[in-house]
Every structure is written in C-alpha cells, then in structure tokens.
Design a protein with these regions (language model features):
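Conserved HGGG/HGGXW glycine-rich cap/lid loop of the alpha/beta-hydrolase fold
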Residues: 59-105
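Active-site loop/oxyanion-hole signature of alpha/beta-hydrolase fold enzymes
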Residues: 97-137, 303, 312
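Conserved alpha/beta-hydrolase catalytic His-Asp/Glu region
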Residues: 172, 197-257
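Catalytic active-site module of serine/aspartate enzymes centered on a nucleophile-bearing elbow/loop
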Residues: 288-325
C-alpha cells in the first residue's frame, strides 16, 4: 500500500513538473515572438567582424581620426545607444559603433562571459577592423574592460572618455559558490529562459529606462521596444550574458591597472545621480590626471538626454588631449 502511494505521488509530481515545463516553454516562445515582432533592429544594416567567439556587428561612419563608441554592457543595450551622437561625431571622426558579444545584432554564444573576454574583443576589433590607434568613448559597465585593454596593450587605444563608470568597490566583488549555482540555473534551457523573461521584459525595461533618465517624458515607446527587442533576439540567448553579469563573472578589479595607465582619460557624469560623481571620484583618487565633467539634469545617459552638451565635452577632452601630445 505504501509503495503504491509513493508511486502515485511520483507520477503526480512528474506529471506536474512536465506540465509546468511545458507551460514555461510556451510562455517563453510567446514572449520571444512579441518582443521581436516589430523588427526595429535590422541586422542587414551592419557590417560583421568574424571574431573567434562569434560574429560582431558594427557600423563605420564619417571621416577623420578613428573613434570607437562602446555601449553599456547590458543585454538590452546595443549601438542604438549612440543614435543621438553618431552624426555629429562623424563630421570630424571615422566613427565605429560596435554591438558587443551577447548584445544587439552580434552573436550570443552559450559561453561564460567575463571581463577578459571583452578585453580581447576590443583589442582584436581595433587591430583587425580599425587598424590603428583609436580614441574610445565608453558607457557604463563597459568602462572597466576598456581600461584593462589599455593596460594590456598600449598600442591600441589613445584617449578614453568614460560615461558614468561603475564604482570600484562593486567591480572588485567576485563569484561565490552560490553565484555558480544561480548561473547554472539561468543557463538551463527552459527554466533559465523563463526566469530571464521574468526579469527582462517590457515592463522592467521601461522601469529601468525611467530610472536612467532625468527627464522621463523623453523616453519614447520606440526606445522601449528597441531595448526589448535587443534583449530577446536570437532565441533569448542574451540570458547567458545576463547570468554572468548577475553572478559577477563580468566583474574585475581594475585597481591594479589604473596606476600604470598613460592614456588621457576623462569621465562624463550625469550629476542628477550623486552616485555617479562619487564613483568618478574613486577613479580620480587612484589616477589624479583623470578629468571629470558633470552634466546637470542628466542621470545614466547624458549622451542621450543632452547630446549637444555631451558633444561639446567630448570635443574639449579630445582637443585637450591632442594639445598635450
């Protein structure tokens, strides 16, 4: 009797698990379809660099000294982040915009994403596609690996302008045993995708954008939908990057490289978020030569909210660096 009862319970729970996974799978497919239905991101508009870990989408615009724009390392982000800046910068520079591995129109392989992976990507992209020493403007969570690329190979990057770099204390945190367990769950085919979809959907993206803007009424429906689509292209395989970021695999302690950098480095911060200025000051404490420019009434995306003022700051920093050479 007891054996029969156990068998019934096992059958019930097995059936329940199967039904639950089936429901999750259907929900995943529906959200993937909804997120990409508008086709706002056209992969045919890009050129592609066949890197050893996957195809990297990029665009080349304008003429003049090379300038590489690196978007924030985030599953929702892409070179779309620079939409308000490219035309003006291209008047005096050859502007390269790149979609990082795991983002935008670039490939999203199921590997472990680390800071060093992106150091290698930036290094190889500059050497193989740009072909000469370049200036770099980099946003948010991508700032650390650009600094590490500078320290790793002094022949590839000239001047660096960072936009709201992350604070150094958080960057130094490393994965734990619990982190590895969470990463494995998020990498699982159905459950991992379902959890990713709970965290990265239209509502959560709209909320994140609202907290990133000082003037929230400037956020358009198209912006939200574009970020939503970017996060779910290629069968939602951005979940691999998401998992690695959430579990600190993309973190790296950059303190060891700051003191040996000879590059001209500047930081532009959105002053309406006090944490941005504090983080910038941390970098300046370790490397006093860093210049900081604050932009009032902006938060995480000053280059989008006040693009004219942003361009003015960029040209000042780039011209100042040229005079020092």
């Amino acid at each position: 009797m007891n054996n029969l009862s156990i068998k019934k319970k096992l059958t019930f729970f097995t059936t329940l698990a199967g039904v639950s996974l089936g429901a999750m799978h259907i929900a995943n497919r529906v959200l993937e379809y909804i997120s990409t239905a508008d086709k706002l991101i056209n992969s045919d508009e890009y050129e592609y660099y066949n890197w050893r870990f996957g195809k990297i989408a990029y665009k080349k615009t304008g003429e003049g000294s090379p300038l590489l724009l690196v978007h924030n390392l985030n599953v929702c982000s892409s070179s779309y982040e620079w939409r308000n800046n490219i035309a003006e910068l291209a008047k005096s520079h050859t502007v390269y915009t790149i979609d990082l591995l795991g983002c935008g129109c670039s490939d999203r392989p199921g590997l472990t994403y680390t800071n060093y992976l992106y150091v290698e990507l930036i290094t190889n992209f500059i050497k193989h596609i740009i072909g000469e020493k370049t200036d770099v403007i980099v946003s948010g969570e991508s700032c650390p690996f650009v600094l590490m690329a500078c320290a790793n190979d002094e022949t590839i990057i000239n001047k660096v302008i960072m936009i709201n770099p992350p604070n150094l204390v958080d960057l130094a945190k490393i994965p734990t045993k619990r982190s590895k367990f969470i990463k494995n769950i998020l990498y699982s085919p159905i459950l991992g995708t379902f959890i990713y979809n709970m965290y990265v959907n239209k509502k959560t993206i709209a909320h994140a954008l609202c907290s990133s803007y000082y003037t929230q009424n400037e956020i358009s429906e198209k912006d939200i939908l574009t970020y939503f689509e970017a996060a779910h292209k290629e069968h939602t395989n951005s979940k691999y990057l998401f998992a690695c970021q959430k579990t600190r695999y993309t973190n790296a302690n950059v303190l060891h490289c700051l003191n040996k950098l000879n590059n001209s480095i500047s930081i532009i911060v959105g002053k309406s978020n006090p944490e941005n200025s504090l983080a910038a000051s941390e970098y300046q404490n370790y490397l006093p030569s860093i210049e900081i420019a604050g932009m009032a009434k902006t938060k995480q995306l000053p280059h989008i909210e006040k693009c004219d003022e942003f361009i003015e700051n960029v040209e000042i920093f780039l011209s100042d660096a040229e005079e020092c050479e």
